[in-house]
């Protein structure tokens, strides 16, 4: 959707009915009355979501600012300082958002949430380590480790057996050469293993820090009559009614 010259202030609702592009959109969709268009952005200017509400429906129920759904099966909460139509959010939606963005605060009002972060298991990283290059590197190193380990062991054993045979035949030069070859072979193998292991441990450590399961420490009231949800709905409807132009 083209919003024309709308203001992009976090937490604000912009009246874009005067914009020609917006008028065309309203005519095409058949919505009739003008609408509020709220562009939700963070401080760095990145667009987070777009909220569209009709002006003549101040009695609409509050909706989640992330999934834009109402309180169907899950209560709406107001865990931060955002007000109006941006103040309601599902707990599960907010937890997914905080987990994907790797933050613990609201990107609009910068309120810190009380959260509990749990690292994801190693099996999830093995299935999806991140970008395609890292996934390819991990697969190649694992395949090389599986094939090179027995190959290095067999080669070292054969070199040592050959060195013993040459020592029995008093061929010390050949024996020393085979022993040196065995030492060089195992040195290269150990160094490659340590470097690869350290590299992937570093990638896993970074992935573990940025991919955590976030759980909000918020108590939700049980039952169909939720007093917190009722107060939240009343406040949101009052805010929408105040912002509706006459």
Swiss-Prot record:
Task of the protein: E3 ubiquitin-protein ligase that may mediate ubiquitination of TFRC and CD86, and promote their subsequent endocytosis and sorting to lysosomes via multivesicular bodies. E3 ubiquitin ligases accept ubiquitin from an E2 ubiquitin-conjugating enzyme in the form of a thioester and then directly transfer the ubiquitin to targeted substrates. Together with GOPC/CAL mediates the ubiquitination and lysosomal degradation of CFTR. Ubiquitinates and therefore mediates the degradation of DLG1.
Membrane topology recorded in Swiss-Prot or TrEMBL: Multi-pass membrane protein
Zinc finger (RING-CH-type) residue numbers: 56-116
Binding site for Zn(2+) 1: 64, 67, 90, 93
Transmembrane segments: 138-158, 175-195
Domain note: The RING-CH-type zinc finger domain is required for E3 ligase activity.
Catalysed conversion reaction: S-ubiquitinyl-[E2 ubiquitin-conjugating enzyme]-L-cysteine + [acceptor protein]-L-lysine = [E2 ubiquitin-conjugating enzyme]-L-cysteine + N(6)-ubiquitinyl-[acceptor protein]-L-lysine
Residues annotated as binding Zn(2+) 2: 80, 82, 106, 109
Protein's recorded name: E3 ubiquitin-protein ligase MARCHF2
Record GO terms (molecular function): ubiquitin protein ligase activity; ubiquitin-protein transferase activity; zinc ion binding
SMART domains named in the record: RINGv (SM00744)
Keywords recorded for this protein, A-Z: Cell membrane, Cytoplasm, Endocytosis, Endoplasmic reticulum, Endosome, Golgi apparatus, Lysosome, Membrane, Metal-binding, Transferase, Transmembrane, Transmembrane helix, Ubl conjugation pathway, Zinc, Zinc-finger
Protein's organism: Rattus norvegicus
Gene expressing this chain: Marchf2
